Structure formats: structure tokens, C-alpha cells
């Protein structure tokens, strides 16, 4: 029964998140009870769930095909930050929105990318390998790249960002991984209900950010939506074209496209709140990306699965 509910929620995740985001935007009073201070804890819950699904075999891929994984990771932390920076400057965003967009770009790949790669008939092993390594590199690369791109605009506390990523991402994933390693036969049963927990947590994060910034989103939202959509779609395109340039097999092209285009926008939202507490609107791009990339990911999977 739980698995059926989880499957249904996972299938309609994009619609659920979109509906809640719309409610929070147009009737913010319905979601103001969800505090923005909960965001870190909700993201920790999602990351813990990700850890429960990881196994040693997921990391074996890194050692068997290090070139593929490292190439993908290098592309991830180069293409998306530069796209974010260029789009932010092109649209002349204010400091808060620029910080938020760049944080989306400098964060690692999204946790849903593995599922989208599977649905696209892409190289799932490469996708999982990239997600795992990108996430482990995030405490070092996300603050460093953010500092390089933003230091002349706003103050960036690199040490605070490092600590926040370790606390919110690495520790929960590591704890989940260890528990899965020790009590695997029990965690497999728990894993059936993880989509329910993850979707609920992500939905609450989006609702909190949107409802508490509804007025400002209504004033500047159109520009942010355009940038988020362009950032995501250009990321997909750049990832696929990189695969074409390197003459990779089609499944690898699909994995690269999805891994590069989809970002851990929940982490971007969390970091925006902790790293830039005086820039409230910095949390908005991550929240909008959370809504959009679930929609675009589903559409892309439906398209790419037909590409042979």
C-alpha cells in the first residue's frame, strides 16, 4: 500500500509541487505557518533519505570509470555556474536575485536526476556516480565558485557555507549510508516510503519560500521565471552537446544532459537563507527552480526515451 502511494506521489510530484507553489503565491496566508527556519531540517530529511538508498556499488562506478564521472563533474561545476552568472548579468538582476541564481548554478546535481535518467533510458550508473561525487565535492567547490562569482557584488562567507553544506548534506547522507549498510534489510522496507517523505519536504520548502516572499515574487517573478527556465534548458542542451562533441554513446549523452541541467535547488534555497540572511529574495530562484525542473525533467524524460 505504501509503495503504491509512493509511486503515485513520485509520478505526480511536479503537479503537486506546482499546485502548492501556486497556492502559496496567490493565497500566501494558507502557507505562512510553514517557517523558513524549517528549510535546513527539511533538506536534511531529504538528504538522509538519499543516503538510505546509497550502496557501496554506487561508488564502484567512480573507480571503474573515473574519466566519465570526473568529466561530468567538471562540466557540472563549470557550465551551470557560468550560465547562472551570464544570465544574471544579462538580465541585470539585483544583488539578492543574482546571489540566488548563482547559488543554484554552483550547487551539485539534483537528487531527482537519477530517476529522470532512468526514465530517459540513459546511463544510470554514470548518473548515480556523478550525483554522488558532485555532492561530496560540494562543500569545497560550491563556496569557492560562489565566492569567485559573487565576491565583488556581495559578501560571501566561504567558511559558513562549507559548514552549512557539511551539516545539511554530507552528515545526513553519511548517516543514511551507514544505517543502510548495517541494517540494509530493514531500510529497504523504509525506502518504499521515501518518495512520500521527500516530496512532502520539498513541497514544504517551496511553500515556505514562496508564501513568505509572495509580494516580492509578484513584483519581480517574471524575470526570475525566465532566467530559471533558460538556465535549466541551456544546461540540458550544453550537457547533451558536450556528449556529442566527445562522441559519447547516446545513454551517456542523456545522463550528462540531465545531470548538468538539474540542480540541487533545495540546497541552493537552504544556503541562500543561511549565507545571505539579509537578502531575503536570494531564496526565491532556488524555490522556483525546484518547481520548474521537476516539470522540465518529466518532459525531457518523455522526449529522450525515444532517442536511440
State where each predicted segment sits.
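Alpha-helical transmembrane segments of multi-pass small-molecule/ion transporters
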Residues: 1-308
Amino acid at each position: 500500500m505504501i509503495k503504491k502511494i509512493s509511486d503515485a506521489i513520485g509520478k505526480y510530484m511536479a503537479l503537486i509541487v506546482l499546485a502548492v507553489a501556486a497556492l502559496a503565491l496567490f493565497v500566501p496566508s494558507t502557507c505562512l505557518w510553514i517557517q523558513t527556519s524549517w528549510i535546513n531540517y527539511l533538506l536534511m530529511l531529504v538528504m538522509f533519505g538519499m543516503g538510505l538508498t546509497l550502496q557501496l556499488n554506487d561508488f564502484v562506478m567512480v573507480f571503474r570509470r573515473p574519466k566519465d564521472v570526473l568529466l561530468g563533474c567538471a562540466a557540472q561545476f563549470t557550465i551551470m555556474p557560468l550560465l547562472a552568472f551570464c544570465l544574471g548579468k544579462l538580465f541585470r538582476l539585483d544583488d539578492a536575485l543574482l546571489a540566488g541564481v548563482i547559488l543554484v548554478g554552483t550547487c551539485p546535481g539534483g537528487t531527482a536526476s537519477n530517476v529522470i535518467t532512468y526514465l530517459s533510458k540513459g546511463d544510470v550508473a554514470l548518473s548515480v556516480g556523478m550525483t554522488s561525487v558532485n555532492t561530496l565535492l560540494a562543500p569545497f567547490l560550491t563556496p569557492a565558485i560562489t565566492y569567485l562569482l559573487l565576491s565583488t557584488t556581495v559578501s560571501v562567507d566561504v567558511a559558513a557555507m562549507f559548514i552549512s553544506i557539511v551539516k545539511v548534506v554530507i552528515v545526513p547522507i553519511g548517516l543514511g549510508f551507514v544505517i543502510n549498510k548495517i541494517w540494509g534489510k530493514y531500510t529497504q522496507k523504509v525506502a518504499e516510503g521515501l518518495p512520500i517523505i521527500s516530496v512532502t519536504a520539498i513541497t514544504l520548502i517551496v511553500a515556505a519560500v514562496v508564501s513568505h516572499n509572495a509580494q516580492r515574487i509578484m513584483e519581480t517573478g517574471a524575470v526570475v521565471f525566465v532566467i530559471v527556465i533558460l538556465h535549466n534548458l541551456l544546461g540540458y542542451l550544453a550537457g547533451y552537446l558536450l556528449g556529442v562533441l566527445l562522441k559519447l554513446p547516446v545513454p551517456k549523452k542523456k545522463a550528462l544532459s540531465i545531470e548538468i541541467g538539474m540542480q540541487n535547488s533545495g540546497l541552493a534555497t537552504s544556503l541562500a537563507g543561511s549565507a545571505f540572511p539579509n537578502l531575503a529574495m536570494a531564496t526565491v530562484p532556488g524555490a522556483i527552480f525546484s518547481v520548474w525542473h521537476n516539470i522540465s525533467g518529466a518532459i525531457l524524460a518523455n522526449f529522450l526515451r525515444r532517442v536511440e
